[in-house]
């Protein structure tokens, strides 16, 4: 039994979707899964690097001072790099997950979707129906006159 037949059997809407739509959703899923794998890898790397830098004193050493061979600069660089990788991978996972959920594949689609979600078309219609103030009307009429070639007619 094929995947499409299984979807039709349980009456999923995806069964009647086009192949292009299915490919698009698979691509979005793959991006999310890849960023999830990168996040898991980065978290594991951060854990290992933290454990490797851990200082465990011997029996009669004090635990309030690091050994003299300890390099604070290297430790800071590793911490900043690890934090940056973790932040980037988690951010990419959030972004790709949101785009997969909203069915967005390009920046242009994201702009359209946000405009729709935030009521951009209705607000644009309301703005177009509002009356102009006197100064704006004078400027608009002047520009229309210039475009129509009436700039020589001085009244």
UniProtKB/Swiss-Prot annotation:
Gene Ontology cellular-component annotations: membrane; mitochondrion
Protein localization: Membrane
Superkingdom of origin: Eukaryota
Main location: membrane
Membrane-spanning intervals of the chain: 30-47, 76-98
Membrane topology: Multi-pass membrane protein
Keyword Transmembrane attached: yes
Keywords linked to the UniProt accession: Membrane, Transmembrane, Transmembrane helix
InterPro entries in alphabetical order: AIM11
Keyword field contains DNA damage: no
Family to which this protein belongs: Belongs to the AIM11 family.
Protein name in the entry: Altered inheritance of mitochondria protein 11
Gene assigned in the entry: AIM11
């Amino acid at each position: 039994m094929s995947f499409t037949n299984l979807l039709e059997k349980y009456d999923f809407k995806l069964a009647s979707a086009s192949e292009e739509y299915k490919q698009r959703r698979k691509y979005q899923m793959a991006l999310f899964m890849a960023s999830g794998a990168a996040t898991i890898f980065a978290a594991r790397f951060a854990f290992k690097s933290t454990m490797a830098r851990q200082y465990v004193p011997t029996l009669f050493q004090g635990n309030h001072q690091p050994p003299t061979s300890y390099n604070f600069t290297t430790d800071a660089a590793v911490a900043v790099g690890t934090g940056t990788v973790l932040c980037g991978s988690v951010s990419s996972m959030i972004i790709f997950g949101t785009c997969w959920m909203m069915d967005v594949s390009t920046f242009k689609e994201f702009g359209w979707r946000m405009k729709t979600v935030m009521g951009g078309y209705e607000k644009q219609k309301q703005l177009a129906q509002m009356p102009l103030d006197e100064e704006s009307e004078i400027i608009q009429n002047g520009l229309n006159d210039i475009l129509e070639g009436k700039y020589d007619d001085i009244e």
